[in-house]
Amino acid sequence: MTNVVVVGAQWGDEGKGKIVDWLSEQADIVVRFQGGHNAGHTLVIDGNTYKLALLPSGVVRSSKLSIIGNGVVFDPQAFVDEVAKLKGQGVKIGPDNLRVAENVTLILPLHRELDSLRENASAATAIGTTQRGIGPAYEDKVGRRAIRLMDLADPQTLPHKVERLLTHHNALRRGHGIAEVDSGALLKDLAAIAPRVLPYADSVWNLLDHKRREGKRILFEGAQGALLDVDHGTYPYVTSSNTVAAQAATGTGMGPSALGYVLGICKSYTTRVGQGPFPTELKDEIGELIGQRGKEFGVNTGRKRRCGWFDAMLVRQTVRTSGIHGLALTKLDILDGFDTIEVCTGYRLDGKEIDHLPAGEGAQARVEPIYETIEGWKQPTANARSWADLPAQAIKYVRRIEELVGCPVALLSTSPEREDTILVQNPFEA
């Protein structure tokens, strides 16, 4: 028995929700360890569609314990709204099966306002954020001025912490020419939301440690993708947290030895939302076709995703930076019917071949992909549930990906339905 960490191996939107839900049946606990309510994911269970943003995917299964770890930035109003929405769909959620780290950093309205102000100030400097306050909240966390969940339970010290926070933010707001935040009004809002979120607060690191010692299976659910990691991604076009697998330890308070098997999720092609380098992007009718077939629009924002061929170099890089043991390859069915399929096997930078994406923003923009052409397949892979259901060329495509990225495929997904999954190796039994 082992615990499992799930991370996106590309730029997010890889289909983690379905895979986490598929794995959650075997887990006792599902825990989010980074990001915020910018990480939309969709679950389709028994014909019912659930759209999540902040809550762990395991929350739709009331028998599982779902946890939001300290590495997450937590919007209390978004939390309350999402819980209410799921309850309206018949999902049983309460403090008995959902816990939130008491030391989690809060996202406040002032964070969302600052995020939006920056993003809309100039198209030239836009990063492509969701404008939900994620980055500014992480800034306050690192700047040691953040309001944390447990602060809401301490009315004696909260006013001082709010004043410290507003000393910083009101200076920024004056510089931008917008109204300052009134400390009294903010304290009133926090007092109103406190009783709706504090019942979920817990010492998560301690809870998880006890559960691990009891032999419970823990599933760590990553958000976004490793290529959006603030250190290892395509900086500055990244998110504001670490998204690689190692963050599962830091973002929950567990030691690295508790993590176990690392499963990387990647599409059979590549997508990206927002700005930033994308070596294999297709700006032609093929890219449009992939986007239409794959329904490549953001769950939270509705933003159209950029589409391109599978980039084996980027996934291989993620396999190394996240220590991935096996891949879950999703949306293979979207490539059905193509005469040929291109796979990026390397890069050319200023006339020289290189085997990884350089760290510099300028170099990333100049990179040219080197492609290998693979014969496509006509027989549909949609809804396949075993290797025997797949056409020979589709199997060859999967095997070639394994060779190029240096990692085996543990799971293969052929539709949004959780049952349409081909299991090669069970991560919990690896």
Swiss-Prot record:
GO biological process terms, semicolon-separated: 'de novo' AMP biosynthetic process; IMP metabolic process
Binding site for substrate: 299-305
InterPro entries: Adenylosuccin_syn_GTP-bd, Adenylosuccin_syn_Lys_AS, Adenylosuccinate_synth_dom1, Adenylosuccinate_synth_dom2, Adenylosuccinate_synth_dom3, Adenylosuccinate_synthetase, P-loop_NTPase
TM ranges: none
Chief localisation class: cytoplasm
Residues annotated for Mg(2+) binding in this entry: 13, 40
Function of the protein: Plays an important role in the de novo pathway of purine nucleotide biosynthesis. Catalyzes the first committed step in the biosynthesis of AMP from IMP.
NCBIfam families (alphabetical): PRK01117.1 (NF002223), purA (TIGR00184)
Family to which this protein belongs: Belongs to the adenylosuccinate synthetase family.
Stated name of the protein: Adenylosuccinate synthetase
Organism: Nitrobacter hamburgensis (strain DSM 10229 / NCIMB 13809 / X14)
